[in-house]
Amino acid sequence: MFTKIFRAVIIGAPGSGKGTISELICKNHGCVHISTGDILRQNIIKNTELGKKAKQYIAEGKLVPDAIVTKTMLARITEVGNRSYILDGFPRNIAQAEALAAREQIDAVITLDVPHSVIIDRVKNRWIHAPSGRVYNIGFKNPKVPGKDDVTGEPLMQREDDKPHVVAKRLELYDEVMSPVIAWYEKKGLVATFKGKQTKEIWPMMELFLNDRINA
């Protein structure tokens, strides 16, 4: 458990493992995982107005418009209140980073450096339980029963945006969009970068970093 409030942003390309890393951090340290993608997908499943707007952008491998994401994420942060959290998928541009900085003091920006070729291969093995957003990675985080969610026993599925041609497009867009954001945070001395091909390689280094930060 974190002994003091710890608020971090995690940045990584789609399929880099940032969702899994975020879940591990929160499971081991008692924080809230706030995922832009999960929030948007939940709205798509529920067919809300936000979900209808987001569905087409995600299916085409495009980013959901800035105004929609900013409003949604700041509202969720407000709900979390005075608790530690990991922001996954936000901010994704300088304007969002500035909007976040005006509201919150971020303690660290965690970046995951995973080769794109590894990511494209990895998404072939990623399955989700759509209603909850739980993610399984065959070969690392396997479901107890193949093709079934551990909690509900309901069928798992692959995301529309995990198809190889969509992933390749998203990776190109990620590099273009996120490089300025990482540079912005680097100037503030907040960035910690972790390189590796698999989550199991990155996680031990992550734990050392987190333990150093919370005990500082």
Curated annotation (Swiss-Prot):
One of its GO terms (cellular component) is mitochondrion. GO terms for molecular function: adenylate kinase activity; ATP binding; GTP binding; nucleoside triphosphate adenylate kinase activity. Its EC number is 2.7.4.10. Pfam families: ADK, ADK_lid. The keyword Mitochondrion applies. Keywords: GTP-binding, Kinase, Mitochondrion, Nucleotide-binding, Phosphoprotein, Transferase. PANTHER family: NUCLEOTIDE KINASE. NCBIfam families: adk. This is GTP:AMP phosphotransferase, mitochondrial. Disruption phenotype: RNAi-mediated knockdown has no effect on viability.
